[in-house]
């Protein structure tokens, strides 16, 4: 049999083989201390010894346990709770994250971070996805990219329906703009989301994760020109027209990181370093972990930011709407 079954396709771990279950192509099961991968749809009562339907992982050029392409294997297991730095460090050591082995960690696996406020379940969205990206703060490849399993909280992007300068006096940038449109203080970076909500999330997580919550650089939109036509189409006006590198510990995802392409993003300045789809979204849809509406990082128009829709569609919403918050963080 040719040893090309796996290639670059994704494997989905299904645990121990069950005779009562049916399986789909690329499902992987454990059986008699071995790992087997389905070559086609497998009917019930078809054990992995049936080579018409199954192939042993080693025969398929899949090495176990540390040779997996972890960005191509989805599992979705509960890994427990972390409420202290000591627990996190024990977790990182147990799973050999620093060496890049990622032992017994797979896409969709999640852990509850007990930060005292958000207490969210964070799932593995990718392994080393942010490696070597940035201007000054550059993560290495031996890191976990995490996103909340569901909405961490709800918040507006801005206090008014604008993707321009925030009118919120609580926004730290207001002291410099006084609410007057100023290039470099608009779009995602100038928003209340980036300046108020994200820093609060970062502070709460840092109290538990310490320096293992990595500071990284994002190349995000900073200027919005209301007269520039948006690539969102349908006559929408208002687009991101400049960007800059900014150091963050948490940031909303781009459309590309979720969908694999832009939909409502107003211009190339909405993508930046977030130019590739997170591996987890090769296995689940944006509503695959529950129906919810949540913000994305892209400007859609002068009044709207991009979002992921409750019913499983790409969307955009008025900036003052309170919607779900699901930031991307990097831990290692």
Regions from the PLM with identified roles:
Residues 64-332:
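Collagenous Gly-X-Y triple-helix signature in extracellular proteins
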Residues 1-83:
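Tryptophan-rich substrate-binding surfaces of secreted polymer-degrading and adhesive proteins
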């Amino acid at each position: 049999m040719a040893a090309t079954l796996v290639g670059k396709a994704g494997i989905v771990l299904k645990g121990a083989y069950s005779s009562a279950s049916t399986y789909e192509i690329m499902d992987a099961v454990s059986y008699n201390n071995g790992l087997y991968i389905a070559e086609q749809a497998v009917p019930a009562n078809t054990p992995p010894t049936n080579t018409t339907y199954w192939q042993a992982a080693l025969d398929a050029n899949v090495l176990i346990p540390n040779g997996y392409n972890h960005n191509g294997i989805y599992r979705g297991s509960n890994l427990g709770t972390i409420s202290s730095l000591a627990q996190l460090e024990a977790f990182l050591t147990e799973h050999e994250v620093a060496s890049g082995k990622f032992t017994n960690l797979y896409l969709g696996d999640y852990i509850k971070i007990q930060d005292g406020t958000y207490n969210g379940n964070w799932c593995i969205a990718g392994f080393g996805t942010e490696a070597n990206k940035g201007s000054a703060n550059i993560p290495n490849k031996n890191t976990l990219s995490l996103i909340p399993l569901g909405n961490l909280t709800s918040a507006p992007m801005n206090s008014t329906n604008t993707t321009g300068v925030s009118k919120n006096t609580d926004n730290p940038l207001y002291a410099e703009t006084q609410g007057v449109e100023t290039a470099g203080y608009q779009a995602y970076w100038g928003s209340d989301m980036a300046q108020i909500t994200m820093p609060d999330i970062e502070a709460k997580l840092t109290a538990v994760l310490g320096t293992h919550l990595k500071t990284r650089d994002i190349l995000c939109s900073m200027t919005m020109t209301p007269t520039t036509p948006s690539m969102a189409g349908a006559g929408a006006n208002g687009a991101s027209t400049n960007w800059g590198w900014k150091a963050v510990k948490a940031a909303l995802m781009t459309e590309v990181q979720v969908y694999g392409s832009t939909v409502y993003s107003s211009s190339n300045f909405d993508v930046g370093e977030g130019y590739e789809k997170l591996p987890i979204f090769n296995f689940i849809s944006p509503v695959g972990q529950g129906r919810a509406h949540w913000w994305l990082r892209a400007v859609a128009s002068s009044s709207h930011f991009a979002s992921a829709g409750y019913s499983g569609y790409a969307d955009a919403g008025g900036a003052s709407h309170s919607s779900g918050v699901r930031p991307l963080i990097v831990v290692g």
